[in-house]
């Protein structure tokens, strides 16, 4: 491969890399809700409503018009109470206000590397904002306010020293209208939480009901946006991941049906609501003037006969974007890791290989180096073929220069004579290029795997590199990487074109500046790949 082909290859790789980093952030157009599909379901008679005191006896009268129903009254004398759920993985704080979630701190993940750093908090709401996991009943006979107070059946739950699951039940009754129960089930060793919502019709007329489960999150408009990760609403609709950029949320949007899950994500963590029946579930997104972003799952419309109950079942996942943990949920939640649509089939096995190596060396930096060596061994024959082809092309440079001078005014003849020269010396001009092109998808797959792997977050390597997911604080590895790239360029067969030679010499400088802010785990991969390539190039040159 001559210098021109190599230049085109390197520039193409650079363009792809820049595209992946700075441009590949767009979200596909949302799938609109199918308005023609019926979402109305008649609930089969369930367990009868439990006996009531005289004060709770149903009153006569027709149910309110679903389109004009107001929220049920809120008892202003109630005081908010907090219920703490403590497990080995997280500490959650629920509130009687809405039977919702007030705090969810992940014990195994910290905000920074500082010794006194706080655990990662998945809930962020400001004063007067409704908490996540609140419910409402839009277009129903009756609705509830997010400020409605529930009664909790226990003051706290401690699961740190047990393997048994526990329940937390919130209940509230509006006499003669409706009784609502929210039942959370916690498992000590899991991030997943089961949620069942039961609504009992206490009236004497059928109750038309359509439930919506919310995740509300405050997004600071002044916060610096992460160039490598998305923070905002995310959902899985009709087997496609939908991401909404918060800064572009101007009007409410609806997605679905066929919503497998929806929620809020950051680069490494996610809070997802998973409905029992995705085919009848739609999703709504909105942002208000106080920068509260709301994601709501809307279920099918139910008709609940008098004295009967409706049941709505969900699973909640609040935790890290660990591929194995997400995949175990069985609803495609692993797709929340942004490997990219055309790279995930390479990124996923590479990430799993990295985790496999870590089980033996217990250092992700070393695991990256070993994986780099294994990939280089896998592509060693292709690399040899590429370097040998470049060497053969270098030998033909004097003859090619003669042809260019001789036929400088006849491009057709120049092309014809050049191909004849290749044929005479049995040289394939693409022989050095194709083996390298085959390796490019593997590089980008590993790039994606390292960029979004939570395993690298706060994971130390050696000496000054204490977080493989963060940039090198002293820029030492990017500079060394640039030096190895410069050395590799010097060892590459030279071109007779001085302009191309100058451009190639600038490539290490460009890549060095690009890598200054890259996660150090990525830089380590590229650095050691360069070192191995230099060794292979030296071996080929010596053999020649």
From Swiss-Prot:
Coiled coil: none annotated. One of its GO terms (biological process) is protein transport. GO terms for molecular function: membrane insertase activity. It comes from the Bacteria. Residues 44-78 are annotated as: Disordered. The chain crosses the membrane at residues 4-24, 363-383, 434-454, 508-528. The keyword Iron-sulfur does not apply. GO terms for cellular component: plasma membrane. Required for the insertion and/or proper folding and/or complex formation of integral membrane proteins into the membrane. Involved in integration of membrane proteins that insert both dependently and independently of the Sec translocase complex, as well as at least some lipoproteins. Aids folding of multispanning membrane proteins. Interacts with the Sec translocase complex via SecD. Specifically interacts with transmembrane segments of nascent integral membrane proteins during membrane integration. This is Membrane protein insertase YidC. It comes from Syntrophus aciditrophicus (strain SB). The gene is yidC.
């Amino acid at each position: 491969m001559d210098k021109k082909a190599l230049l085109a290859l390197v520039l193409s790789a650079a363009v792809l890399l820049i595209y992946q980093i700075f441009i590949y952030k767009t979200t596909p157009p949302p799938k609109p809700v199918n308005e023609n599909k019926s979402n109305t379901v008649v609930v089969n008679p369930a367990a009868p409503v439990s006996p009531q005191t005289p004060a709770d006896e149903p009153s006569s009268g027709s149910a309110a018009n679903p389109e004009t129903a107001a929220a049920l009254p809120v008892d202003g004398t109630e005081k908010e109470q907090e219920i703490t759920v403590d497990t080995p993985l997280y500490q959650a704080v629920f509130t009687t206000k809405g039977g919702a979630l007030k705090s969810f701190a992940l014990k195994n993940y910290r905000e920074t590397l500082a010794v006194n750093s706080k655990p990662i908090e998945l809930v962020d709401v400001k004063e007067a904002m409704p908490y996540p996991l609140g419910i409402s009943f839009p277009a129903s006979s009756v609705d509830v306010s997010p400020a409605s107070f529930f009664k909790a059946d226990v003051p706290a739950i401690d699961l740190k020293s047990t393997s048994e699951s526990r329940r937390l039940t919130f209940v509230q009754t509006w006499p003669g209208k409706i009784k609502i129960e929210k039942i959370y089930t916690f498992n000590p060793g899991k991030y997943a939480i089961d949620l069942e919502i039961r609504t009992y019709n206490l009236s004497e007329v059928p109750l038309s009901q359509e439930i919506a489960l919310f995740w509300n999150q405050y997004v600071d408009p002044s916060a610096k946006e992460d160039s490598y990760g998305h923070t905002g609403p995310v959902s899985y609709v009709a087997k496609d991941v939908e991401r909404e950029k918060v800064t572009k949320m101007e009007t409410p949007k609806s997605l679905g049906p066929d919503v497998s899950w929806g929620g809020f994500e950051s680069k490494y963590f996610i809070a997802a609501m998973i409905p029992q029946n995705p085919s009848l579930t739609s999703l709504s997104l909105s942002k208000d003037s106080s920068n509260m972003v709301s994601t709501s799952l809307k279920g099918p419309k139910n008709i609940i006969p008098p004295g009967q109950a409706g049941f709505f079942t969900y699973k909640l996942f609040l935790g890290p974007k660990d591929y194995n943990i997400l995949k175990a949920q069985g609803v495609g939640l692993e797709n929340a890791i942004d490997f990219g649509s055309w790279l995930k089939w390479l990124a996923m096995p590479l990430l799993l290989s990295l985790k496999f190596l870590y089980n033996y060396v217990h250092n992700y930096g070393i695991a990256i180096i070993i994986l780099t060596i294994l990939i280089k061994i896998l592509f060693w024959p292709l690399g040899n073929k590429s370097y040998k082809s470049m060497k053969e092309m270098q030998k033909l440079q004097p003859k090619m220069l003669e042809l260019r001078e001789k036929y400088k005014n006849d491009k057709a003849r120049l092309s014809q004579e050049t191909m004849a020269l290749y044929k005479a010396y049995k040289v394939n001009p693409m022989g050095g290029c194709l083996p390298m092109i085959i390796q490019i998808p593997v590089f980008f797959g590993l790039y994606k795997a390292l960029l979004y792997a939570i395993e690298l977050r706060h994971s130390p390597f050696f000496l000054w590199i204490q977080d493989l997911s963060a940039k090198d604080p002293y820029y030492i590895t990017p500079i060394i990487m640039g030096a190895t790239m410069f050395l590799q360029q010097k060892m590459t067969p030279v071109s007779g074109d001085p302009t191309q030679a100058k451009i190639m010499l600038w490539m290490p400088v460009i890549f060095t500046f690009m890598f200054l802010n890259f996660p150090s785990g990525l830089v380590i991969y590229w650095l050691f790949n360069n070192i191995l390539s230099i060794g292979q190039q030296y071996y080929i040159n010596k053999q020649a």
